[in-house]
A protein has these predicted regions:
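Helix-enriched interaction subdomains in cytosolic or periplasmic regions
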Residues: 37-59, 166-170, 179
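Iron-sulfur-associated redox domains of electron-transfer enzymes in respiratory
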Residues: 61-265
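Non-heme iron-sulfur electron-transfer modules
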Residues: 12-42, 56-81
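Structural motif corresponding to the C-terminal cap of alpha-helices
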Residues: 14, 53, 57, 194-198
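Short charge-dense sequence patches
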Residues: 2-4, 20, 52-62, 141-143
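Local cysteine-cluster metal-coordination motifs and their immediate loop/turn environment
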Residues: 1-12, 41-56, 128, 156-160, ...
Length: 265
């Protein structure tokens, strides 16, 4: 429809200039700028172009198949399935089903995930606490040796922010904390400490993360996010929309969902 909203949000607000107008006249379309492909365009994967498109011409990668399809892990039970949920997802799933905040408790969300077939359900807030502790400890260490570090110190918990800084301000990369994001900390815990706790080989654990941001999909695929040497610490990332879509496809009676506790790592 040539509304150019994706171009405007990326250029004027995000300042990345990933999208641009291609061709002219009746053949005018939107494409990645400077003739590049999306992998070469320094995209931060913030998802704003997707959010602002009124006709869904842009969309994030759909990763439901390896989890929920007939040959997916929940149906074949080839591995122990573990899922972690970000705090922001609690509110978003409630809005999708028009549930009150009081009714859509974290425990009810945990109950929904167990109903779907996950063996273990974790709350990512545990790993968020670890991130705060790690970043806080690192900050104190830097304060003791100010002359050895570049300032200020930036958080590294958001992969979209990290990608943005690396592409737009490479001279400030050393300001980033060395701590992993909560998602990846939780993934490392699941494939290491928790695998040991339940006497399971990390290779036999299928780790799923439900997050509000599509940048998490790229983060989990980074080669550095393999703490066991057996594969990614987080195997699949689903965004809130994918999770809600699958819930709706199951025709789950959300008002009949039982409350259940999150597992303790």
């Amino acid at each position: 429809i040539k509304c150019m909203r994706c171009i405007q949000i990326c250029d004027k607000v995000q300042s990345l200039k990933v999208w641009d107008i291609a061709k002219t006249g009746s053949r005018t379309t939107v494409n990645v700028s400077l003739g590049r492909n999306i992998k070469e365009a320094d995209c931060a994967l913030c998802g704003q172009c997707i959010t602002h498109c009124p006709v869904a011409a842009l969309s994030g990668r759909d990763d439901k198949r390896p989890v929920f399809s007939q040959n997916g892990m929940l149906n074949t039970r080839r591995k122990t399935t573990v899922v972690q949920v970000a705090p922001a997802v609690r509110t978003a799933w409630a809005e999708a089903f028009r549930l009150s905040r009081k009714f859509a408790s974290p425990e009810r969300l945990a109950g929904a995930l167990r109903l779907m077939g996950f063996d273990y359900v974790f709350d990512t807030t545990y790993a968020a606490d670890l991130t705060i502790m790690e970043e806080g400890s690192e900050f104190l260490e830097r304060l003791k040796h100010k002359e050895d570090y570049q300032w200020p110190m930036f958080t590294s918990c958001c992969p979209g922010w990290v990608r943005f800084l690396k592409s737009q301000y490479p001279d400030m990369v050393d300001c980033l904390s060395t701590a992993k994001s909560p998602q990846q900390m939780q993934g490392a815990i699941i494939k290491n400490y928790f695998a040991d706790k339940i006497h399971e080989d990390p290779e036999n654990i299928f780790s799923v993360s439900i997050m509000p941001c599509i940048a998490k999909k790229a983060e989990c695929a980074l080669p550095t996010m393999d703490s066991t040497g057996t594969g990614p610490d987080v195997d699949v990332v689903l965004n809130t929309r994918e999770f809600v879509d699958y819930m709706k496809s199951l025709n789950i009676d959300v008002y009949g969902l039982p409350e259940d506790r999150f597992d303790s790592p």
